[in-house]
Design a protein with these regions (language model features):
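Catalytic alpha/beta core of large soluble enzyme barrels
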Residues: 118-126, 130-144, 430-431, 524, ...
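A glycine-rich phosphate-binding loop feature that marks nucleotide/adenosyl-phosphate handling sites
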Residues: 41-42, 60-63, 78-84, 190, ...
């Protein structure tokens, strides 16, 4: 008699019927898969004392190897087999235990925040959980969930199952609601049905003691050593807790600039970016991956040429930053000079700092004044040659990322409180930031403290007038002896965004959008108050603007299932209709929340407060891409909504942004964000090897509508982006797919 060794170490007689039970369940109700084929091809070599783990892994691998374009459903077979294995690993039996047992175990392991379960009726929520929703997972989706999101004990073993995880996240995000039990169920339904998925930090950390839920941060560095090193500290803290970072360096003086009256003293921005690069490597994200930091400068900065060389493999290594993502913050004037084949002037920001504070016509006017000023040091370059260098690097390395300053700021709903200086790592978040401001702090021997601006004129007791930054402890003021002079910081603004994405493959009708969007907006708004903030400046900024970023994913799958060709007119019309509905319902939901919980503190004076919406920033060329009946027509009652917002306010200063969704789209088994598929079949590298993946719901009916990205006219991607952008107050992470034959010098010269 053959025996089998269970996970517990216990030995029992081998029972083939138990194996058949699991294999039968794994193929149930799936087309074009075969139980006999699975069992025969597994070729399990039964022997005495074979382990159940070995049997299970053999079956899983057999199913995975069968995934192909003509039989995509094998991914669900593999997922079910993996889940059966996971149930046993977590619970010791096939299925779910009680929600209370899950919480007790998680608290004991120190992985679930104490007290959360005490705020709810666990018996009620346990009965609400629908374990059948596990059947939605593809194999790569459930593997991603297991490897990246499920809580583990100190040995690295999973201690939660998917539906418990989704319910715990929902409970965490609903805990401050007056009727938290009901809202937990609504949040759970959205997440567990794969209708809306929060971003990775929320999935990973909501329910845990270290509940850092935000995806990305955006900051700015001032032009002084205190501010530069405070930026290093801030970036380190943000990276430590898993945030992606976008950071503006445009204010830092160029190489060869003056410092304290000394010529050629400044080393420029590059040495500081080298330190930033080392921070990204040294301060990894909770040990899971290296930090991810995008660094931005404007194209008039004198260090622009060296900046574009940051990722080159040749040259002086001390001036290379292979782990950073260089990004350009481009103004319209630069693009006009390229079109005109004109000259472009480079400045040291120490001489022209207000260029960072201006955009549009005001920037153009000031920039041209500096060009004409003979007292301002400057360098000249042909705009087209600089642009050619940008594109050469772009084609060779994928960087610099390109973002457009004037467009971002013209659409900024909160331009009354500042300026957008850069975007984030993934170039979809556009919010106001402000570098720290430093003042001179004079501490007297009697304990009195006085603050001065650095260039403020101060008259000492001996009658000498000095700049405040030149005051020392040898001076006396008003008969008082100075103990020490140091710099004090007035913190600026570091923007933060909390993201979630609507799965368009499941939510694409007016009825579903109207149902789903208000729940998603409330869920994201709750993230703001429940978040762990790594830095006080980040929390203060987020509470002032209450920024969220509701986006979409699964666009390509939705189009394929509805037999709509990518980039055709029907595509533009469909996405225009959907994005309008999302925009309308998101704005309405935020206004309703404002009525219930209060408007964001910076609402007064915003474009929202004046009834100005994202659609009002759309240009006529974009509007003409889709015929809405005349030049432009409405599907929703926008005028009524404008009046409502002016009257009731907005809960969130920033509302919509389309993120890349690289991990969460895999988790829910749909196509990434707004992008076409790269291929109809490809392989994803995983810890367990290469996993075959096919486009979602691939069939003879959808095959022709899954056009690979590299086969498309890339202008179609830009047109689709323009249609979406009409309805978005922030931005969208948009990729362009270029093959090597289209990135040659010939095309650059053309």
């Amino acid at each position: 008699m053959l025996t089998v060794i269970k996970r517990s170490g216990r030995t029992e007689p081998l029972d083939i019927s138990k194996i058949k039970k699991y294999t039968s369940e794994s193929v149930k109700d799936l087309d074009n898969v075969s139980l006999s084929e699975l069992e025969v091809d597994a070729k399990i070599q039964f022997r005495d004392q074979i382990t159940t783990t070995e049997i299970q892994q053999t079956l899983i691998k057999t199913a995975v190897d069968k995934i192909d374009v003509d039989r995509p459903n094998w991914t669900f077979v593999a997922a079910r087999l993996f889940l059966y294995d996971l149930y046993h690993r977590v619970n010791g039996f096939s299925g779910y235990g009680h929600l209370r047992d899950y919480f007790n175990r998680g608290e004991k392991e120190g992985r679930i925040v104490l007290g959360l379960k005490d705020k709810y009726d666990l018996d009620d929520l346990n009965s609400y959980i629908d374990v059948r929703r596990d059947l939605q997972f593809t194999y790569l989706g459930v593997k991603t969930l297991h490897d990246r999101y499920l809580l583990k004990n100190r040995k690295g073993e999973p201690i939660e199952l998917p539906q418990h995880m989704f319910m715990a996240i929902a409970m965490f995000l609903a805990q401050n609601e007056l009727n938290s039990q009901d809202w937990a169920k609504k949040f759970y339904d959205l997440i567990s049905k794969f209708e809306v998925m929060p971003a990775t930090p929320t999935l990973s950390n909501a329910r845990t003691p270290r509940h850092q839920l935000s995806s990305c941060y955006i900051g700015s560095t001032p032009d002084n050593i205190e501010g530069i090193f405070d930026s290093f500290k801030e970036m380190s803290l943000l990276s430590k807790y898993g945030g992606g970072i976008g950071w503006d360096w445009s204010l830092v003086r160029a190489m060869g600039g003056m410092i304290d009256g000394h010529k050629n003293a400044a080393g420029g921005v590059i040495p500081f970016l080298k330190i930033t690069n080392d921070i990204a490597v040294a301060v990894d994200q909770l040990g899971t991956r290296k930090g991810a930091i995008a660094v931005y400068i404007e194209p008039w900065h004198m260090d622009i040429s060296d900046f574009l060389d940051l990722k080159k493999n040749s040259g002086e290594e001390r001036r290379r930053t292979h782990e950073l993502f260089p990004s350009l913050w481009i103004n319209d004037l630069f693009m006009k000079r390229i079109e005109q084949d004109a000259m472009w002037t480079l400045f040291d920001p120490a001489d022209t700092p207000d260029l960072c504070e201006l955009y549009g016509e005001e920037f153009d006017k000031r920039y041209e004044e500096y060009e004409k000023n003979p007292n301002i040091p400057k360098e000249f370059v042909k705009a087209k040659e600089l642009w050619k260098k940008v594109l050469t690097n772009y084609f060779e390395s994928g960087s610099p990322f390109l973002c457009f300053k004037d467009n971002a700021n013209r659409a900024n709903p909160n331009n009354h409180t500042g300026i957008i200086r850069s975007s984030n790592l993934c170039t979809e978040i556009f919010q106001n930031t402000q570098p720290n401001h430093y003042v001179i702090k004079v501490v007297f021997n009697n304990g009195e403290v006085r603050l001065f601006e650095e260039d403020e004129d101060i008259k000492t007791d001996d009658g000498i007038v000095k700049k405040a930054k030149k005051i020392t402890a040898l001076d006396t003021l008003d008969g008082k002896t100075i103990f020490i002079v140091e710099k004090d910081v007035k913190e600026g603004k570091t923007a933060v965004c909390n993201l979630a994405s609507i799965n368009l493959s499941k939510v694409n009708t007016q009825e579903d959008i109207k149902r789903v969007v208000p729940i998603a907006v409330r869920m994201l708004d709750n993230v703001i108050d429940l978040n762990f903030y790594p830095h006080s400046k980040v929390k203060r900024t987020n509470l002032l603007s209450r920024s969220i970023g509701l986006g979409v994913m699964g666009e390509a799958q939705m189009l394929a299932e509805q037999s709509i060709a990518w980039g055709g007119y029907d595509h533009l019309a469909k996405i225009d209709e959907i994005m309008e509905a999302i925009s309308y319902n998101a704005i309405k939901a935020s206004s309703n929340l404002s009525l219930e919980k209060g408007a964001y503190p910076e609402f007064e004076g915003s474009k929202w407060s004046k009834g100005i919406f994202p659609i009002d920033a759309a240009n006529e060329n974009t509007k003409r891409l889709v015929d809405r009946g005349g030049l432009f027509g409405y599907t929703h009652d926008w005028e009524k909504l404008r009046e409502k917002v002016k009257k009731d306010g907005m809960r969130n200063g920033y509302l919509m942004a389309i993120a890349p969704t690289s991990s969460i789209s895999i988790l829910v088994g749909t196509t990434q964000t707004i992008e076409p598929v790269y291929k109809r079949k490809w392989f994803e590298e995983n810890l367990s090897g290469m996993i075959p993946v096919t486009a979602p719901k691939l069939s003879p009916d959808t095959w022709g509508f899954y056009t690979p990205a590299y086969e498309l006219d890339q202008k179609l991607l830009i047109q689709a982006g323009a249609v979406r952008q009409k309805w978005i107050d922030q931005g969208q992470s948009l990729n362009i797919f270029i093959t090597l034959d289209k990135a040659s010098g010939k095309y650059l010269n053309d």
